[in-house]
Amino acid sequence: MADHSASGAPALSTNIESGKFDEKAAEAAAYQPKPKVEDDEDEDIDALIEDLESHDGHDAEEEEEEATPGGGRVVPEDMLQTDTRVGLTSEEVVQRRRKYGLNQMKEEKENHFLKFLGFFVGPIQFVMEGAAVLAAGLEDWVDFGVICGLLLLNAVVGFVQEFQAGSIVDELKKTLALKAVVLRDGTLKEIEAPEVVPGDILQVEEGTIIPADGRIVTDDAFLQVDQSALTGESLAVDKHKGDQVFASSAVKRGEAFVVITATGDNTFVGRAAALVNAASGGSGHFTEVLNGIGTILLILVIFTLLIVWVSSFYRSNPIVQILEFTLAITIIGVPVGLPAVVTTTMAVGAAYLAKKKAIVQKLSAIESLAGVEILCSDKTGTLTKNKLSLHDPYTVAGVDPEDLMLTACLAASRKKKGIDAIDKAFLKSLKYYPRAKSVLSKYKVLQFHPFDPVSKKVVAVVESPQGERITCVKGAPLFVLKTVEEDHPIPEEVDQAYKNKVAEFATRGFRSLGVARKRGEGSWEILGIMPCMDPPRHDTYKTVCEAKTLGLSIKMLTGDAVGIARETSRQLGLGTNIYNAERLGLGGGGDMPGSEVYDFVEAADGFAEVFPQHKYNVVEILQQRGYLVAMTGDGVNDAPSLKKADTGIAVEGSSDAARSAADIVFLAPGLGAIIDALKTSRQIFHRMYAYVVYRIALSIHLEIFLGLWIAILNRSLNIELVVFIAIFADVATLAIAYDNAPYSQTPVKWNLPKLWGMSVLLGVVLAVGTWITVTTMYAQGENGGIVQNFGNMDEVLFLQISLTENWLIFITRANGPFWSSIPSWQLSGAIFLVDILATCFTIWGWFEHSDTSIVAVVRIWIFSFGIFCIMGGVYYILQDSVGFDNLMHGKSPKGNQKQRSLEDFVVSLQRVSTQHEKSQ
């Protein structure tokens, strides 16, 4: 605790005029236990900052900034045709916008008609269009009309659903639009980035994405700008007055004013055509999956047709009959509704996520989020509240806590716009240090250098009321200690006590801030440590437990010290295997073999004292081990990791750079929002997966049955009934996008070998059931079989096929037995209506002009339910079968040693490369 002995560093001036200060009251207030500051307590911080600004000249400086950028940092007249005292006027802005247009890349407006026509393009659609041509050639205008209607129905439904869902997402995306702060009409204004025009004076600071090309005009400017998206440079580039900055680059450090020299297509990015729209609705891997499925089904159709043609030519069937057989196989062989249903499911899911404050930047992000196995999460704001509160300080012998607090507050921002959470916490706690609070405004800030992520310090140069020049430092304790040690030796007992206190605070979960000062040209003085805590969010522990049940591993990556990270991780139930990121040894040192580095990262619960490169390395290593990785971030430095991750997640309050790099942007705080979105994405993926299995099984079912029936018995279903089977299969399941699908308790991804294996098995079971139905109608018993006594063979088969196929979706949509999950009313209602319609077809003999007895209909319903139960049993047994999965994949344990050797080589190469870069 604080040592109040008289010896030690002389205190700063905290003198107050006689009679103006109640010392007893102050002592009672100063040394009573400091309670944590409540989350919603903002007390008179803004008023206090305004008071500080007015005393040290910052207020005047900001007013001057509104007139002349940077308080005297005037833009040269020969560089700009802009009034340097007021920026552009409203009239000039209008004129320049009329001349140069909006600051955005010219994009061809999406032609809705062409987009609609796109729903008629693809392997599956081409087959159906070929079937329509074939029907027209046979002059079967009924089938021609029905096939065209089916194609049109799928296109209309897909287009309308995607358009409506896209509109919802676009509306919310508007809240993510990049902003720009410009000087106009004498004031600094925040505007939308597209509204920037040439000649605008733009204010940029850490975290800003520069919206247009420009030239720095601030006299003493020092910016570090990330241009990696343009030039591939991995390190930030230093920029000074007169240097050019480019659109889409991100400011990593510093602040300055920039005059805009080019906008829109005239920027470097525009000319190079290198800007990729991160918010495109790319469909990603699932489009490749669908095209692959369509191609394979097309091959199966061709194979089945070869069998049909050979058998037909062998029997010398008429060409018209052969064409009718061809038309039937073509219609049932490819699921025309597959692309529309899957795209609709994704679009509706994106709209649903948007309503839950998760903005999907591209549809493929839903698919990748559903498969995420490891979440690399930052600590502050995601796992914790990002609301710091101070606790009792540790002071070096002879240092007054009031003096420590005053020095720490002097090394704090005095601008409302630039104040960070740490500075805000210090100013809030000033009420417990009345003497420091009363004199703080008497000190004038001459220079202020915000937190530097490399030196891990904040530095301020101030002038005391007596005119003394004082340098105040606040930052990471060991870095502050190093600053003092570089100036002069520190007594061993002071040094050891200081380090012990840092370790003690860390084990208790506190984040420590060291405080030091230098008077004039004197020596540096170490004052002490101020502990603060960013407590875990109230829901984080529960959410972490839920994440574990969902098969999601969370690794915490934080810049805090190991002790703090380990204690926070313990409180949250994440585990205590937290290590210093330097142990990875990827910065040029380290002797751990590459494969052991990979094992180390895989086994760790998180890493502390991380830099941006460490985050990138961790994500890359986990990906190379075969994991799908999500990464959360909010700052400029997180952008490379967000891009590298399979799913980049920008958390609430993220910088423009992080939002641009992310796949999903969250507008709600905390880990709970991410886990909620993950569950929703798994539901969406499950709907797609269930429908794909269902639809492939249906195609295989009828290809097997009709192919064999034609080849063996030279018979086929009435072509009109075949068309309606295809219609019913698609119409009944269009509502799958709105189903109450269960979400998997484990990460999900496209398991194509297993998907095909399961679909083929279900298709075979369906085909066997239909074949049994046919054989009973050929039976020669006492009653002569169903067909002679009860109705028409084609109508009975039509009903049996329709019922068993429609009910299959109830099996594939469930994770367990089909009764374990209740389907939505939309899906149940659609299937029920189709079943009733199919029954009416059969009873009244539509297209066959032959009635079917109600007895036969009841028998078919009962028989179909039996087939449904068998399919349900097969699916339930095999869906979680490791043996079946391995059989489909042909997995082998060989090759692991080869992988580890490759990992050793990659890490060795990376270390050599890093050492070479450092030696340059």
UniProtKB/Swiss-Prot annotation:
Transmembrane segments: 116-138, 141-160, 292-314, 322-354, 688-713, 721-738, 755-779, 807-826, 827-847, 854-878
Extracellular topology ranges: 139-140, 315-321, 714-720, 780-806, 848-853
Signal peptide: none
Documented EC number(s): 7.1.2.1
Residues bound to Mg(2+): 634, 638
Cytoplasmic side: 1-115, 161-291, 355-687, 739-754, 879-920
Molecular functions (GO terms): ATP binding; ATP hydrolysis activity; metal ion binding; P-type proton-exporting transporter activity
Main location: membrane
First-level EC class: translocase
Domain of life: Eukaryota
Function: The plasma membrane ATPase of plants and fungi is a hydrogen ion pump. The proton gradient it generates drives the active transport of nutrients by H(+)-symport. The resulting external acidification and/or internal alkinization may mediate growth responses.
Protein name per Swiss-Prot or TrEMBL: Plasma membrane ATPase
Organism: Neurospora crassa (strain ATCC 24698 / 74-OR23-1A / CBS 708.71 / DSM 1257 / FGSC 987)
Gene: pma-1
